[in-house]
């Protein structure tokens, strides 16, 4: 049967968690990894792999987090030079902007040296999932300028939505924290969180559900299990960015295409067991956007829907991107998805 993940089809967190968990299992060396929604009135996300029951899946997640919680991992690396002085993670795509050419060169040198280290260290693995996430997150855009100056944040993945208040960044203040939390759990606690038997939100120290940001924008603020959030944030790896000289980098699933603050995320709903590669191909396709947005061209929408159906999709999900009114550190989060069956 496989692991049935906690969460509704109308929550982007559930799709991201399925994609992230599938990637983690492939990085563990699992064979025939599959994921998809059940064909039911209330669909559930199911992830399977040959020889992996719920406990084995949880062990893989635990080992994955433990390896990245250790000192010296890429998640543990900070930018050492000014203006960061060890207070920003090396691979966070949104950090304090460099103020000079030497600072930009320092940032690029540190990033490239560590990427080279990752490539050399992972040559024998079947799949280097770390580089997949690093690449998908994007990077500070040294090439982007506008009338009012540099725009380094335009090189970042739009689904990396950690608020930047108090100088916080995605990896140092979220991914690194979750790695340690999941590493400190045992397999049974990880299973419980992933399948929804319990919701343990160790990353949030308060008592009000509507103030927890553990989901990091993939849902509206609410209590979120840390293991589920860990998998979901690795799901960002399935949403690559394409950098552009003359505009903000394009992130898969973001609508309008190329807008710095998109209005919507569009996801496909694949029913049945599909490979991660199939999911990723559909996620980045123009057809998934056309099916959800081609109001002016019925022919284009029909063609897109036919293509999606041929690739396993039954519907699309459209999520509104909510943005707070804080001008200094605007908070983005995804609302509930609008499910639309393919015509």
Regions found by a protein language model. Name each.
Residues 7-10, 220, 224-227, 231, ...:
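Elongated scaffolding segments in large macromolecular assemblies
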Residues 1-187, 204-208, 229, 237, ...:
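Conserved small-residue
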Residues 155-157, 190-218, 234-247:
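Short linear interaction motifs
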């Amino acid at each position: 049967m496989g692991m049935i993940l906690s969460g509704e089809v109308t929550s982007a967190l559930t799709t991201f968690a399925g994609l992230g968990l599938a990637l983690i299992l492939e990085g563990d060396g699992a064979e025939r990894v599959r994921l998809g929604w059940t064909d039911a009135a209330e669909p559930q996300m199911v992830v399977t792999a040959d020889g992996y029951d719920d406990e084995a899946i949880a062990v893989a997640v635990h080992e994955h987090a433990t390896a990245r919680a250790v000192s010296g991992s890429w998640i543990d690396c900070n930018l050492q030079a000014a203006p960061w002085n060890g207070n920003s993670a090396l691979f966070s795509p949104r950090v304090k902007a460099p103020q000079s050419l030497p600072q930009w060169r320092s940032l690029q040198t540190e990033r490239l040296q560590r990427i080279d280290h990752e490539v050399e260290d992972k040559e024998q693995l079947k799949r280097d999932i770390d580089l997949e996430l690093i690449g998908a997150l994007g990077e500070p855009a040294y090439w982007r300028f506008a009338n009012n100056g540099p725009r380094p944040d335009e090189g970042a993945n739009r689904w990396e939505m950690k608020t930047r208040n108090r100088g916080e960044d995605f990896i140092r203040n979220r991914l690194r924290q979750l790695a340690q939390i999941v590493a400190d759990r045992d397999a049974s606690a990880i299973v419980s969180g992933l399948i929804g038997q319990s919701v343990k939100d160790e990353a949030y120290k308060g008592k009000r559900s509507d103030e927890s940001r553990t989901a990091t924008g993939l849902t509206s603020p609410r209590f979120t299990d840390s293991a589920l959030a860990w998998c979901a944030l690795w799901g960002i790896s399935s949403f690559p960015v394409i950098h552009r000289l003359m505009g903000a980098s394009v992130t898969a699933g973001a609508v309008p295409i190329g807008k710095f603050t998109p209005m919507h995320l569009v996801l496909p709903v694949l029913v049945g067991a599909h490979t991660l590669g199939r999911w990723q191909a559909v996620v980045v396709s123009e057809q998934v956007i056309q099916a959800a947005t081609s109001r002016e061209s019925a022919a284009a929408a029909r063609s897109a829907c036919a293509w999606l159906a041929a690739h396993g999709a039954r519907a699309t999900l459209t999520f509104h991107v909510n943005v707070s009114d804080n001008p200094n550190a605007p908070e983005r989060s995804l609302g509930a998805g609008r499910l639309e069956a393919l015509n």
